[in-house]
Design a protein with these regions (language model features):
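N-terminal pre-domain/capping segments
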Residues: 1-77
Length: 77
């Protein structure tokens, strides 16, 4: 099954620009034909208790989780 996803960061920006709630943006995303959301791992850690139920309520799923790593400071050369 193919899923079309949107980055949650775009949804967060839409909430700011349009002054709408998370539930409203989730409903709009679903209405626009998206099935899933790509989420930053840190956002899930910090806001998952709010975001995940709203996604589920709208019939959306988490299609991918990404994170950013600072490898230049992780490895000692």
């Amino acid at each position: 099954m193919n899923r079309i996803s949107v980055f949650y960061e775009h949804m967060a920006e839409a909430m700011k620009q349009e002054n709408i709630t998370l539930d409203e943006v989730c409903a709009a995303v679903k209405r626009f034909g998206f099935d899933g959301v790509e989420l930053d791992a840190n956002r899930i850690k910090n806001e998952g208790d709010v975001i995940l139920p709203a996604l589920q309520k709208a019939g959306l799923c988490v299609n991918g989780i990404y994170n950013f790593f600072d490898f230049i400071h992780f490895f000692v050369f």
